[in-house]
Amino acid sequence: MLRTKITGSSHVLRTAFKRYSSTIDSGAVEVVKPKKTSFTRRLFRLGLAVTAFYAGGVAVSQYDDDLGTLFTEKVPGAEKLVDSYVTYRYDPTISKMLSTEYLLNLFKGENTEVKPSTSSRLVPIHDAIKELHLELLELDSENNSEPEMQKIINSLNSTINMINEQKLRIGGKKSRSIEENYKQLIEDILHLDKNLKETVSKSINEKTEEVVKKVREQYKRKLAVSEVELQDKYKNEFIHLKEEMEKHYQDILNQKLEANKQHLEAKHANEIALLSITQVSEFNKIIKEKVDSERNGRLAKIEDLDKKAENLTEALKHVNKVVTRNEAVKQIAQQIEIIRSKLNSHDLNSISLHDDLTRLRTLTDIAVPGPKPCCKHKDLTPSLFRVALDELESVAGSSESKILSEEQIYNRWNLLESDFKTASLLPPNAGMLGHFTAKLFSLFLFTKRGSALPDATDLDSVFARINENLRHSKLDKAVADVVTLKGWTHVLCDDWLKNARRKLEVEKLVDVLDSELKSL
């Protein structure tokens, strides 16, 4: 309520001083008769509408501050018009000039001189107009005021600063009246601050006593309850601790008893073992004495017999090793012949050497042993036989890698006959049309058969010579002729050349194995 009252007072002060803030301004009014034309009539109506709008805005601004603020901010020249209206309204001379009586006399042509009022003539100048200055309200720093009271005082001081910044000049009586009311307002605020602090202090003391009393009662109740709870808690903990300690020490006792039992059993077992060892040593001593006595008699030649038996065993081992190695060499020779017969066969199916090479590896480990794992000498190298066997396993040792037979190589070469005819008719750098034309005319060519001249380089002669070499199982010469081919013909024979080289490599490795086997 106090804050509302102070805010209302500040609003009244602000409104009152705003109305007295302008100076008196005089002027003459010149009446001009408009010409009776349509343009002047429209101009007159427009001026009348603008005048009515501004007059209505000024009238509304005197009764509603929000609309007045909106009018002065949004309409051009509205702020000056409102200030002039306030000045003329509260000035006695101007008010009399704008009175109804003055206007009637003006229209009748009578003397309309405005005489200043007697009161205005009797009042001195320094009493009639005085600059208003209000002192700010300050509370004593030693008194701790409430935050709400401090906010009210700050709001009032901001309003007073706004009034002082306007430097309002008003009559002396009104100034003194305003100052007296302001002093009374300050006294009321200070008295209200004092009463508010006393009321707050008294309320705080009463609330504090009530809270302390309640806290003490709650503390006594909680203390009694906590005492009972603590007694029960410690009693239960003591019983639980007692049971745990009994269990713990009972377990320790059982463990110690078990350990002592095991210790006694181990000690007893050790004593029995020691006794048995002693008895065995005594028995061994007796046996040794008996053997020594017998050795010096009937068993005097037993050591010589033992050495001869060891020599015989070593001789038998060596003979067995030689026989085993010779048998393994024979088996290796047979296995090499089996592989060679498969390679030279005219079977239509591919040749798989996985099982044969596995058996050959087993026989090689027996007949041609490699370096011992314990030997770390750097100069030791595997034999040529084992190197060739390793290379042969890398080429054809897997179960999926198969070697083409002689018949398959020959048949696949014959499949390239039509492509060779086409290639023999191709011009250099032939395009699609050249390939098509060569393919067409190759249908009219005959294939050359039989032996061809060794020096002939035309494709027909080369094809016939390779065909003849394959027919006589001369794969190495056929491969040599294919290698000499160039260009498109070499591309056509690429897959066939890979398979033929692979078969030829296997044959050469088999020949190496056969040669090395003869030197073993």
From Swiss-Prot:
PANTHER family assigned: MICOS COMPLEX SUBUNIT MIC60, MITOFILIN
GO process annotations (BP): cristae formation; protein import into mitochondrial intermembrane space
Topological domains, Mitochondrial intermembrane: 61-520
Protein's name in the database: MICOS complex subunit MIC60
Transmembrane portions of the chain: 43-60
Family statement drawn from the similarity comment of this UniProt entry: Belongs to the MICOS complex subunit Mic60 family.
Superkingdom of source: Eukaryota
Transit peptide feature, positions: 1-20
Keyword entries, A-Z: Coiled coil, Membrane, Mitochondrion, Mitochondrion inner membrane, Transit peptide, Transmembrane, Transmembrane helix
Keyword flag Coiled coil: yes
Coiled-coil segments: 176-325
Annotated membrane topology: Single-pass membrane protein
A GO cellular component annotation in the UniProt record: mitochondrial crista
Compartments it resides in: Mitochondrion inner membrane
Quaternary assembly: Component of the mitochondrial contact site and cristae organizing system (MICOS) complex.
Pfam families listed in its UniProt record: Mitofilin (PF09731)
Mitochondrial matrix-side positions: 21-42
Record's function text: Component of the MICOS complex, a large protein complex of the mitochondrial inner membrane that plays crucial roles in the maintenance of crista junctions, inner membrane architecture, and formation of contact sites to the outer membrane. Plays a role in keeping cristae membranes connected to the inner boundary membrane. Also promotes protein import via the mitochondrial intermembrane space assembly (MIA) pathway.
